[in-house]
From Swiss-Prot:
Coiled coil: none annotated. Catalyzes the transfer of 4-deoxy-4-formamido-L-arabinose from UDP to undecaprenyl phosphate. The modified arabinose is attached to lipid A and is required for resistance to polymyxin and cationic antimicrobial peptides. It is found in: Cell inner membrane. Residues 1-235, 291-322 are cytoplasmic. It is a multi-pass membrane protein. One of its GO terms (cellular component) is plasma membrane. Pathway: Glycolipid biosynthesis; 4-amino-4-deoxy-alpha-L-arabinose undecaprenyl phosphate biosynthesis; 4-amino-4-deoxy-alpha-L-arabinose undecaprenyl phosphate from UDP-4-deoxy-4-formamido-beta-L-arabinose and undecaprenyl phosphate: step 1/2; Bacterial outer membrane biogenesis; lipopolysaccharide biosynthesis. Residues 257-269 are periplasmic. One of its GO terms (biological process) is 4-amino-4-deoxy-alpha-L-arabinopyranosyl undecaprenyl phosphate biosynthetic process. This is Undecaprenyl-phosphate 4-deoxy-4-formamido-L-arabinose transferase. It comes from Shigella flexneri serotype 5b (strain 8401).
């Protein structure tokens, strides 16, 4: 039996990218939710290279009287998951909660995640109820969730919601992983012994626009496919075998037709030959592109460059920069 340790301190990690409109409300509501826990807490806000006034607002929030906010400023935009990993490297709590800055997942749900974690779960995920996103975002999210479930075998309902709670040993395990393409909910479930999901409210976005454009969602899907599994390479081998068998069968058929109908038929079959040729060429290019993705990931990981660069850390206990 594993001993269940009660949560003593909660760390809330929030990546921020051009969210100056939502920051005052985010800080107020998150602080109120954490105060209601009756536990020690800290709120880590990571500025992911914002071009608006977000970074300055975070510094002011950390330097305010009786503040519980730790501001981490990255030197440029590295992406949501890299920013969260930067926050993970500075947490001091034994339960870490991730939250988006857009307030679509309300901070008021934090006490429910803490209560569920106190039951002994390593990871507490969430499922968005009455989701208030566009049809495109919902459809893309369903496709990505199904892809993840099929490739990882982990039957979690919603990997896209970042409102999640992780025990400290899960976060420490993730910090020891050095691959460049990191998808935190999946990585956490790899190390979790006990994981659960709970339904949470999902609100409309009040401030700004989503930072996930169509191309960023496509890139995310490529990242998921290439960093989670080698199944596409196996499928590519299977496709190559099918094409080889199909090509040999067509060649035999063409010889038979040539012998049966004579040379006149061969001229009329030119377009068919071109169609078959283009099919094979297309399959080859798809395979080359897929192999290139994997080789590119390997090349990036081998270089072992840092996932992010922290420019400044401002803690509430001191106004001196780290």
């Amino acid at each position: 039996m594993f001993e269940i340790h009660p949560v003593k301190k909660v760390s809330v990690v929030i990546p921020v990218y051009n969210e100056q409109e939502s920051l005052p409300e985010l800080i107020r509501r998150t602080t109120t939710a954490c105060e209601s826990l009756g536990k020690e807490y800290e709120i880590l806000l990571i500025d992911d290279g914002s071009s608006d006034n977000s970074a300055h607002m975070l510094v002011e929030a950390s330097q305010a009287e009786n503040s519980h906010i730790v501001s981490i400023l990255l030197n440029r935009n590295y992406g949501q998951h890299s920013a969260i990993m930067a926050g993970f490297s500075h947490v001091t709590g034994d339960l870490i909660i991730t939250l988006d800055a857009d307030l679509q997942n309300p901070p008021e749900e934090i006490p429910r995640l803490v209560a569920k974690a106190d039951e002994g779960y390593d990871v507490v995920g969430t499922v968005r109820q009455n989701r208030q996103d566009s049809w495109f975002r919902k459809t893309a999210s369903k496709m990505i969730n199904r892809l993840i479930q099929r490739t990882t075998g982990k039957a979690m309902g919603n990997y896209g919601c970042m409102l999640r709670a992780y025990r400290r040993h899960i976060v420490d395990a993730m910090l020891h992983c050095h691959e460049r393409s990191t998808f935190i909910p999946i990585l956490a479930n790899i190390f979790a012994r006990r994981a659960i999901e709970i339904p949470v409210h999902h609100a409309e976005r009040e401030f700004g626009e989503s930072k996930y454009s169509f191309m960023r969602l496509i890139n995310l899907m490529y990242d998921l496919v290439t960093c989670l599994t080698t199944t596409p390479l196996r499928m590519l081998s299977l496709l190559g075998s099918i094409i080889a068998i199909g090509g040999f069968s067509i060649a035999v058929l063409l010889v038979i037709l040539r012998l049966t109908f004579g040379p006149q038929w061969a001229a009329e079959g030119v377009f068919m030959l071109f169609a078959v040729l283009f099919t094979f060429i297309g399959a080859q290019f798809i395979g080359m592109g897929l192999l290139g993705e994997y080789i590119g990931r390997i090349y990036t990981d081998v270089r072992a460059r840092p996932r992010y660069f922290v420019q400044q850390v401002i803690r509430p206990s001191s106004k001196e920069n780290e």
